[in-house]
Design a protein with these regions (language model features):
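Bacterial N-terminal signal peptides
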Residues: 9-17
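An alpha-beta-alpha
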Residues: 67-75, 86-90, 178-228, 319-353
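Flexible loop/hinge segments that line or gate small-molecule binding clefts
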Residues: 137-175, 186, 193, 286-299
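Hydrophobic alpha-helical
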Residues: 122-124, 128-148, 213, 227, ...
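Hydrophobic alpha-helical segments within soluble ligand-binding/sensing domains
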Residues: 46-54, 115, 168-194, 208, ...
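Hinge/cleft segment of the Venus flytrap/periplasmic-binding protein
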Residues: 23-65, 216, 307, 313-385
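Short beta-strand elements in bilobed, periplasmic/extracellular small-molecule ligand-binding domains
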Residues: 92-109, 194-196, 217-236
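Extracytoplasmic "Venus flytrap"
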Residues: 26-28, 34-93, 104-116, 133-137, ...
């Protein structure tokens, strides 16, 4: 049985072990999760998997807490989805429960030095915890240690940080990239030319997923990767960059492996080029789903790597559980990719949908990183609400 078939079975029914992982701390994670989501054959070698320094730690700050969100970028619809969840749903319910007072947001526009400065300022101004998103895995490390020394923990959503003082939460990106590549290769018959569209090079979320795609395609000798294009996880950039490449190259393309958040723009570029509408990986952009909803034979599934609202709630829940002293076992809590078929998409995307929609699908925290799932990674796991 191929990994693709195993992944499909696991995601549709239950986790099935595919390999054993020999690591003391991972031995404390249930085998079905460990052998699938933490399979070393599909793990970024730089993913932190040691015991968390927060295992016997509890915040000494009184409730309610203020969390600083040091965002690295604001220029795409994915980040918009994060903000909508944090301020539209999460903060109000946590305020009502007496857990949070506020979430303070900064933006650094992909400049590490600015993000570092903002994290230090947030720490010095008295926030009780920090979350960051999609950041350089190494550059922030001294600042994370600085915050830790002040009693302020840092959680990363959508990509790992290598500091021993960081908490990382995300999908297993290398596994997800491999799955997307395997799915696309099988969809186009195991042969042909493909274009990979990565997100923001240099961020762990982009790089890990990109490597997973390369590894997946490498297992198909008749598949050729003819281009690797960065699109900054932004539809407008994806459209412009792909249009540029398509106009400059006559190479036949049989499929597109697009990191989600850029797929609406990539789809627009392909459609406007006059080329055949060949399979493309979709992962949550409603504009792209609009096309698929009305062309149901286009592909057979969407594969989610990071539904924005759910990814944000995932990180916040882990951070707050840690601050409450629940005993975080491991440095990185990882989840598997999630998928939906066209019938599901048609249930929430209307026929008269907007191809230029700026909305992004969220699958629900109960499907992405449920309280039951998170409990496996804490010594004394308990839902916040």
């Amino acid at each position: 049985m191929t990994l693709l078939k195993k992944l499909i079975a696991m995601l549709a029914v239950s986790f099935i072990g595919v390999a054993s992982v020999n690591a003391d701390i991972l031995d404390e994670i249930p085998a079905d999760i460990r052998d699938f989501v933490y399979d070393p054959d599909f793990m970024d070698p730089n993913q932190p998997l040691g015991e968390s320094v927060y295992r016997n730690w509890k915040s000494d700050r009184p409730l309610p807490w203020t969390i600083g969100y040091a965002s690295s970028y604001a220029g795409n619809l994915w980040r918009k989805g994060v903000m909508e969840r944090l301020y539209g749903d999460y903060l109000p319910k946590m305020k009502e429960a007496g857990i949070l007072n506020d979430i303070v947001v900064t933006q650094s526009n992909l400049k590490d030095a600015v993000q570092i400065q903002q994290m230090r300022q947030l720490t010095d101004q008295g926030v009780d915890g920090l979350i960051v998103c999609c950041s350089n895995p190494v550059a922030l490390n001294p600042t994370i240690e600085y915050a830790y020394g002040k009693g302020v923990p840092t959680a990363s959503m959508t990509g790992y940080l290598t500091s021993e003082y960081a908490i990382s939460t995300s999908v297993n990106y290398k596994l997800t990239g491999y799955y997307i590549a395997s799915w696309l290769a099988e969809t186009i018959g195991g042969e042909g030319n493909v274009v990979i569209m990565e997100g923001i090079p240099g961020t762990s979320a982009s790089d890990s997923q990109h490597q997973g795609m390369l590894d997946g395609f490498a297992e198909y000798p008749d598949i050729t990767v003819v281009a690797e294009i960065a699109h900054m996880w932004t539809p407008q950039i994806a459209q412009a960059e792909l249009q540029k490449w398509l106009s400059a190259n006559t190479t036949q393309v049989d499929g597109f492996a697009v990191q989600s958040s850029g797929e609406s723009g990539a789809l627009n570029a392909l459609e406007s080029s006059g080329r055949d509408m060949v399979p493309m990986a979709l992962g949550g952009g409603i504009g792209a789903f609009c096309y698929w909803r009305n062309n149901p034979d286009f592909i057979d599934r969407a594969i989610y790597a990071w539904p924005p609202g759910d990814d944000a709630e995932f990180a916040m829940n882990v951070l707050l559980r840690t601050m409450k002293g629940q005993g975080l076992k491991i440095q990185s809590i990882l989840v598997p990719p999630y998928e939906e078929d066209v019938e599901t998409i048609q249930s929430f995307v209307p026929e008269d949908c907007d191809r230029n929609s700026s909305e992004f699908r969220t699958v629900g925290i109960e499907n992405w990183a449920s309280d039951e799932y998170l409990n496996n990674f804490f010594d004394n796991g308990e839902a916040l609400l």
